[in-house]
């Protein structure tokens, strides 16, 4: 992806980015936070819609691991808006496994990268826009964030890690 646009009509926030051109919120340049330690990071996630016991166990295992290894965890509803939250420093990191599809993450991926962040698969592998799995973070905590999540296996109702 080379262009990203995310608009929140309730707050009138327009996030935009073009590859190589920086990231913006309502025409003001934005950048990711500079938090350097996972233990000080504010993390966003979403719980998803699968309710089989094994998938719920995997989800709650990841949430527990994040609660134990970050400052705090938030669930606020939108993959794209959470990614923009990372891009502007409202969040230090975000991950979601099992969102709807590329429309939920492609624009956010461009915006986060142009704001100085990283976008990966939660396993640490390369981000796949069709994989329905995303992790984004400021440039300092990405690998520590992956380390926390990678210890918890995926649930059977979730898109699986790349091979």
Give the label of every model feature segment.
Residues 1-83, 132-163:
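Acidic beta-strand-loop-alpha-helix segment within the catalytic core
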Residues 4, 23, 108, 115-117:
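Small-residue (primarily alanine) positions within well-ordered alpha-helices
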Residues 92-96, 119-121:
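Paired acidic/hydrophobic, glycine-rich loop segments that form the ligand-binding mouth/hinge
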Residues 116-132:
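Acidic, metal-binding active-site segment of PIN/NYN-like and related structure-specific nucleases
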């Amino acid at each position: 992806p080379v262009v990203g646009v995310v608009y929140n009509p309730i707050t009138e926030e327009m996030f935009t980015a073009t590859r190589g051109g920086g990231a913006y919120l309502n025409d003001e340049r934005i950048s990711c936070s500079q938090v350097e330690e996972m233990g000080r990071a504010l993390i966003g996630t979403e719980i998803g819609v699968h309710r089989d016991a094994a998938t719920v166990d995997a989800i709650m295992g990841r949430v527990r691991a994040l609660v134990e290894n970050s400052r705090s965890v938030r669930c606020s509803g939108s993959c794209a808006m959470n990614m923009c939250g990372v891009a502007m420093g409202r969040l230090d990191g975000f991950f979601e496994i099992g969102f709807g599809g590329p429309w939920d993450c492609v624009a956010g991926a461009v915006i986060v990268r142009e704001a100085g962040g990283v976008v990966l698969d939660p396993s640490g592998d390369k981000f796949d826009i069709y994989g329905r799995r995303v992790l984004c973070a400021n440039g300092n905590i990405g690998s520590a964030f992956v380390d926390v999540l990678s210890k918890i296996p995926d649930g059977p109702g979730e898109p699986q890690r790349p091979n």
